[in-house]
């Protein structure tokens, strides 16, 4: 029997990289899914959000809509706040009106990124960028409006076949460049959208069953690495020489928004809720490769 017999799921931001992964996964598992991309629902429009949620009356809403342009947020703070801060509030208020659960995606950028140990879910936040501040505002809005049915799911370093991302860029650069410079002083967790979508589905089902407490969850592939270690691993899976990836520093590649130096996330809350956390990032990267290579028009390398 399907674990999703009747309840309807509403996915916002369904045309983005994560939404494109989550929507078909829910459909395959027998859920009734309404998928609304940016062209169908602007979450900054409170009236439109209330109307959509009232019309579809979902049991679970997963908000994949977000302003993810980290650097551009520094020069467009009001726009970023409208999407990342006010949008989740509109959704939370609409969910409260119909009794729906809300899964709100968030980010490692809510932390300062200056520590050296994995951040627990209850660790004090301290964003250093406009983007991080707007995402924290969205978290607070959801938890304020939906203390019993609001779920914050923090993730990081997303990649997948449904949109642009670091791994896809490395696949392209391996074909175009002799050597590639990648920063070696940022530590985090690459996260495959397929694995994240699977855990979102499990968390939503557990929320409906009353077995997963509301609050904050960290959802990244486990383990930790640097961009400069992820890039050579990508080259290796392509059958290319990993030594073509050369290290550089964040300072040398300065950008408008500061990047966290260390933003590895602890996932203890999954087991406390009776759910398995995501697997190790290396296993996920290996399994993701056929889809990523297919999107890039590259043949999938055989075993070496």
Curated annotation (Swiss-Prot):
Gene name for this UniProt entry: strL
Cofactor, how bound (note): Binds 1 Mg(2+) ion per monomer.
Enzyme nomenclature, EC number: 1.1.1.133
Alphabetized UniProt keyword annotations: Antibiotic biosynthesis, Carbohydrate metabolism, Magnesium, Metal-binding, NAD, NADP, Oxidoreductase, Streptomycin biosynthesis
Cofactor: Mg(2+)
Positions of the record's site feature: Could provide a fine-tuning to achieve optimal pKa matching between active site and substrate: 107
Signal peptide as annotated in the record: none
Record's function text: Involved in the biosynthesis of the streptose moiety of streptomycin. Catalyzes the reduction of dTDP-6-deoxy-L-lyxo-4-hexulose to yield dTDP-L-rhamnose. RmlD uses NADH and NADPH nearly equally well.
Catalytic residues identified in the record: 131
InterPro entries xref list: dTDP_dehydrorham_reduct, NAD(P)-bd_dom_sf, RmlD-like-bd
Protein's GO biological process: dTDP-rhamnose biosynthetic process; polysaccharide biosynthetic process; streptomycin biosynthetic process
Protein's name according to its UniProt entry: dTDP-4-dehydrorhamnose reductase
Source organism: Streptomyces griseus
Cellular component, GO, one term: cytosol
Family: Belongs to the dTDP-4-dehydrorhamnose reductase family.
Keyword NAD: yes
Residues annotated as binding dTDP-beta-L-rhamnose: 107-108, 157
Catalytic activity, reaction form: dTDP-beta-L-rhamnose + NADP(+) = dTDP-4-dehydro-beta-L-rhamnose + NADPH + H(+)
Quaternary data: Homodimer.
UniProt binding sites for NADH: 16-18, 42-43, 66-68, 131, 135
Residues where NADPH binds: 17-18, 42-43, 66-68, 131, 135
A single MF term (Gene Ontology): dTDP-4-dehydrorhamnose reductase activity
Pathway: Carbohydrate biosynthesis; dTDP-L-rhamnose biosynthesis; Antibiotic biosynthesis; streptomycin biosynthesis
């Amino acid at each position: 029997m399907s674990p999703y017999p009747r309840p309807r799921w509403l996915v916002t931001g369904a045309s983005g990289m994560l939404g494109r992964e989550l929507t078909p996964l829910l459909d395959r598992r027998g859920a009734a899914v309404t998928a609304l991309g940016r062209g169908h629902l602007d979450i900054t429009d409170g009236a439109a959000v209330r109307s959509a949620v009232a019309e579809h009356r979902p049991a679970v809403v997963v908000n994949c809509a977000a302003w993810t342009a980290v650097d551009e947020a520094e020069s467009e703070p009001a726009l970023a706040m409208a999407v990342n801060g006010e949008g989740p509030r509109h959704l939370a208020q609409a969910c409260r009106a119909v009794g729906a659960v809300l899964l709100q995606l968030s980010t490692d950028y809510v932390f300062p990124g200056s520590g050296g140990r994995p951040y627990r879910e209850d660790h004090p936040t301290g964003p250093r960028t406009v983007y991080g501040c707007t995402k924290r505002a969205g978290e607070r809005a959801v938890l304020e409006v939906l203390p019993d049915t609001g779920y914050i799911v923090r993730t990081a370093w997303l990649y997948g076949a449904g949109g642009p991302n670091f791994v896809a860029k490395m696949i392209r650069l391996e074909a175009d460049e002799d050597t590639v410079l990648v920063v070696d002083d940022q530590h985090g967790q690459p996260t495959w959208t397929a694995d994240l979508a699977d855990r979102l589905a499990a968390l939503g089902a557990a929320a409906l069953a009353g077995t997963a407490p509301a609050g904050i969850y960290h959802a990244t592939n486990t383990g930790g690495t640097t961009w400069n270690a992820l890039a050579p691993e990508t080259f290796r899976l392509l059958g290319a020489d990993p030594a073509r990836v050369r290290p550089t520093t964040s300072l040398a590649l300065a950008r408008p928004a500061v990047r966290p130096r260390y933003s590895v996330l602890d996932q203890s809350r999954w087991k406390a809720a009776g759910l398995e956390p995501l697997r190790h990032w290396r296993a996920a990267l290996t399994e993701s490769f056929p889809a990523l290579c297919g999107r890039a028009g590259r043949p999938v390398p055989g075993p070496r």
